[in-house]
Design a protein with these regions (language model features):
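Adenine nucleotide-associated cytosolic modules
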Residues: 1-137
Length: 137
């Protein structure tokens, strides 16, 4: 799920895309690339933004949610819907050479993203990371 289009500045760190896809929807191009690698997989691409209006309906279709988004508002939204729907939430984030990954709301473990970052307003006020995330994965 991504409402953005491929830009030339993505290419050094987002390996699903090439110059040929610049200007095209990221979600659709990622789906095409992954299906070209393995034709037996099923991918549902959502070339739009996750919102309070569509999140519950989309998340309800899946058993587990894996999140690699780049903003706190979306992380809190995913977290809250996963709690509501009793879905495990796998969270991943990167800034520079530092990364985080965690699993929330799994089995009897009731810890969630808000336990890790309880102050949503404070997180929203944090400055964005500097440009130039290194593509070292």
């Amino acid at each position: 799920m991504d409402d953005d289009v491929v830009s030339i500045s993505n290419l050094q760190r987002q390996i699903l895309y090439s110059e040929a896809e610049v200007g095209m929807p990221k979600a659709i191009q990622a789906k095409k690339r992954l299906e070209a690698l393995n034709s037996s997989i099923q991918i549902n691409a959502y070339p739009n933004r996750l919102t309070t209006e569509n999140a519950a309906g989309i998340i309800s279709q899946y058993d587990i949610v894996v999140d690699g988004c780049d903003n706190f508002a979306t992380r809190y939204l995913i977290n809250d819907i996963c709690i509501e729907q009793k879905k495990p939430y796998v969270y991943g984030a990167i800034c520079g050479f530092e990364g985080q990954v965690s699993v929330f709301n799994y089995g009897n473990q009731k810890k969630n993203y808000r336990d890790l970052y309880p102050d949503e307003e404070e997180m929203q006020r944090m400055p964005p990371p500097p440009k130039g995330v290194m593509g070292v994965t």
